[in-house]
Regions:
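A helix-coil-helix interface module used to build multimeric assemblies
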Residues: 1-192, 196-202, 211, 266-267, ...
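Glycine-rich cofactor/substrate-binding loops
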Residues: 1-22, 46, 65-69, 270-435
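Amphipathic alpha-helices that form helix-helix packing interfaces
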Residues: 30-33, 118, 122-125, 129-132, ...
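Alpha-helical support elements that line or immediately flank enzyme active sites
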Residues: 31-32, 110-122, 231-240, 245, ...
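Conserved hydrophobic residue
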Residues: 40, 253-254, 372
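A structural signal for small-residue-enriched, beta-sheet-centric alpha/beta enzyme cores
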Residues: 99, 191-192, 204-206, 211-218, ...
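Short, well-ordered beta-strand elements within core beta-sheets of diverse protein domains
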Residues: 157, 225-233, 361-369
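Acidic, glycine-rich loop-and-beta core segments that form the ion-binding/anion-interacting portion
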Residues: 200-293
Length: 435
């Protein structure tokens, strides 16, 4: 992923040096586990622990060797072996293991670290959502369906929806992250013929990982597909929120807008512009994460016990998707935390249709008072369509219709068009969401 969208801590997880450090962590765990069982000499394991290293120079050496041997794990073991300084000890590095014992298990360590960062981001975003939902718990806003005014809500209720979805994302992601926290040291085809299941489990335990109950040469890629699917859902939620902010920032609506800095400029040609560029960026980058999930599905089907077709794909989609999820969560947290809200504009828009938004309540009240539903629907729609076409006040038209007023008197009609009546259950919904 380009540096523009990479936050520092997540970037370190996926750096070349970070990756090779995790590879070395797996190699050391294996040699120490084998030393405890008398397979590897204790002195050799100690020498490997003490001297083997990965730094910028070693990373360059790995690249140099890989250009010759055309195999990254072999280049790694050669370069790290040189740092040990004792050929007798270095020969035990990578003992009994195949490349993907190291690569897949180390990848699990990287994903565990990346997942911790993302989980922290999700929690922090949820805290901001809850704060802003409570801030606007009783701020009336028109609810829209198909982009058209429907019935009243509160802006806090809209944000509460975002909060609840974010909480589901946290639960989903936690499950997917646990599915990825597994290692395998079962050899070239998964039969554990060189080291055995007990040693495999012990190495994984030393690394703080579960052991994959069964594997081929690789951990099965349904786990990866689930993980990336969860990231796709997570970032789709962020896109959904960003898209809503973009709609609310339209000039004709202007009920909310993303933060706009004091020295920020919206256009090189039009000085008046305050464009929702951050929200647009979120919408764009979420598409990349979704596309990457599709690539992960393609990696599930491999030839027999493994081919390498998934490897090149994962070198892109795993870093890019976790880096983008981290970036987008931080971005949306900033946007929602600094979002400007215009309650007066919300109320003006809500009132702009002259009571049309209460047509559903009027229909219900007429039926409850004894009118036939088809008759009531016809009367209400007749006035609603006329109010749309002539831009007249719906409430006044209804109050002048004897077919309606003989069923609902003035007091009853005032109750029909009462905004507070529409919003009377908001507190109960909040108690349910934030319990």
């Amino acid at each position: 992923m380009i540096s523009r969208y990479t936050r520092e801590e997540m970037g370190r997880v996926w750096s070349e040096e970070g990756k090779f450090r995790r590879w070395l962590e797996v190699e050391i765990a294996a040699t120490e586990t084998l030393a405890e069982r008398g397979v590897v000499p204790a002195a050799a394991a100690a020498k490997i622990r003490e001297n083997a290293r990965v730094d910028a120079g070693v990373v360059r050496r790995i690249a140099e060797l890989e250009s010759k041997v055309k195999h990254d794990v072999i280049a790694f073991t050669m370069a790290v072996g040189e740092t040990i300084g004792d050929p007798g000890a270095a020969r035990w590095l990578h003992y009994g293991m195949t490349s993907n014992d190291v690569v897949d298990t180390a990848q699990a360590l990287q994903l565990r670290e990346a997942s911790r960062l993302i989980e922290h981001d999700i929690v922090r975003f949820g805290e901001v959502l809850e704060r802003r939902a409570r801030e606007f718990q009783h701020t009336p806003q028109i609810g829209r369906t198909h982009g058209v005014h429907a019935e009243p809500i509160t802006f806090g209720l809209k944000i509460a929806n975002w909060f609840a979805e974010n909480r589901r994302n946290l639960e989903r992601f936690g499950h997917a992250a646990r599915q990825m926290a597994v290692g395998k040291i079962s050899g070239a085809v998964g039969n554990a013929s060189h080291l055995g299941p007990e040693v495999e489990a012990a190495i994984c335990k030393r690394l703080g990982l579960e052991v994959a109950p069964v594997a081929s040469q690789v951990i099965q890629r349904d786990r990866h597909a689930e993980y990336l699917s969860t990231l796709a859902i997570l970032t789709a939620t962020l896109e959904k929120i960003a898209l809503e902010i973009r709609h609310l920032q339209r000039t004709e609506v202007r009920e909310a807008e993303e933060p706009f800095g004091g020295e920020q400029r919206g256009s090189s040609a039009m000085p008046h512009k305050r464009n929702p560029v951050s929200s647009e960026q979120v919408c764009g980058l979420a598409r990349v994460v979704r596309a990457n999930a599709g690539a992960a599905y393609e990696n599930i089907a491999l030839w027999h016990e493994r081919d390498i077709s998934h490897s090149s794909v994962e070198r892109i989609i795993l870093p890019d998707s976790t880096i983008l999820a981290d970036y987008l969560l931080a971005r949306m947290t900033e946007i929602v935390a600094g979002m400007r809200v215009f309650p007066e504009r919300m109320r003006r828009n809500l009132d702009s249709t002259g009571g049309l938004i209460y047509s559903g309540q009027l229909l219900q009240d007429l039926v409850e008072a004894g009118a036939a539903r088809e008759d009531a629907y016809k009367w209400v729609q007749e006035h609603a369509m006329a109010a749309w076409e002539t831009e007249t006040n719906f409430q006044q038209r209804v109050a002048a219709d004897p077919r309606i007023t003989k069923i609902l008197d003035r007091v009853a009609l005032e109750h029909t068009f009462d905004l507070e009546r529409q919003l009377r259950h908001v507190d109960a919904i909040f108690a349910r969401v934030f319990s």
